[in-house]
Each structure stands twice: as structure tokens, then as C-alpha cells.
Amino acid sequence: LGNRTGIDLPGEKRGYLVDSAAHENRHKRLKWKWARGLILNLSIGQGELVTPLQVASMVGGVGNGRELRRPHLLKEILDPRTGKVVGLPESTLVRKLPFQADHIAAIQQALDSVVNGTQGTAHACRLPGIRVGGKTGSAENPHGDKTHALFAGIAPMESPEIAIGVVMENAGHGGSIAAPIAAKIFRRYFELTGRLKPDTTRKEIHVP
């Protein structure tokens, strides 16, 4: 977080991950000093700015055991005359998350519990035969009467191959708004890869 992912698009933003020096420089005119209470706020995401792609990249790194890889929009390069594949984007390792293996395992277990645990907030993201893990979020919104709804998830938990970040502005709670959207994306991915049968029933998600 706080760094560009390196995706092959111009204009990507870094987001904002605050530390004491950055905080005091940003609020120099108001003389708002760094305080311990700000650390508690940061632990729940208060005062930070992230892009949906950073959210997906982060949860993907947790899922695959600490590796952050550069995302690409490009799937393959085709020869226009023959239609044959002549190139593929490289899977470049950007960095490794600086966490111990047991810490990563604890986070993975927590992600699993959010979707599959009895008190989890993302039951809407469950899929038959596919174990999904994730985290919901409902971020305070100073520009509307509803929170921003967030969900970050990976699947399948035993060997993750897809990571998703969903952000719905001024939409409500992450568990009731963002998680069902993520479930549709997960389902479609596993339908396309042959792990799930196509869902013939159409369900609509209404965002107030």
C-alpha cells in the first residue's frame, strides 16, 4: 500500500499510507502533531487511501504466501496475420510482504472465517465446492449518508488463483453490497475454468 502496482496503464496513483513524517508535513500549517491515537486509527484503515487494485494486490499477496506480482491488463499478444500467440506478459515479482509465515497463516485463517465462519460477515460470498476467503469493509464517507462498501477476497483458499477487490462508493455495508458482487465475479471465473456449472438463475443486486 502507498506504492504503485506497476499495471500497464498511465496515471496510476500511489494512494496514501501515512507515517509520522508524512502526517506532520501534510498538516504543517495546522501544527497537527503525530499522536499514538493515530496509530490505532491506522490499524482499522482510518486516514489511508488505497485503490481497488491495491486492495486486490494486497489480498492476493497474502493468499499466495507473501508475493506481490505486477498486474497486467494484457492477456496475450497475437500475430494479426496468423492469429497465433506470439507473446505473453511476464509475471514479475515486485516485492515480498515482510511478514513471518505464521503471521500470514493467521491472516489466511481470518479471511477464511469471514466467509465460512458462523459469525462471518461475508456469507454472501460462499460458493458450492469452492472455499472463498475474504474481508468486508464499511468505510466512513464524509460525502454521503452511506458508507463505502468494500470486499477483498481470494479463492480457492487451499491454493488461491484469483484475487478480487470490490469498492462501491456511498453504497452501504461491505457484507451486503460488495461481497455479493465479488461472489458473482468468483462464480463466473470458476464457471469459465470448468469448476462450477453455469448459474442459469438470474439474480439482481440493487444498490440503494
Located regions from the model:
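Short, gly/Ser/Thr-rich active-site loops of penicillin-recognizing serine hydrolases
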Residues: 84-92, 181-208
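Beta-lactam-recognizing serine transpeptidase/beta-lactamase-like catalytic domain environment
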Residues: 1-167, 174, 205-208
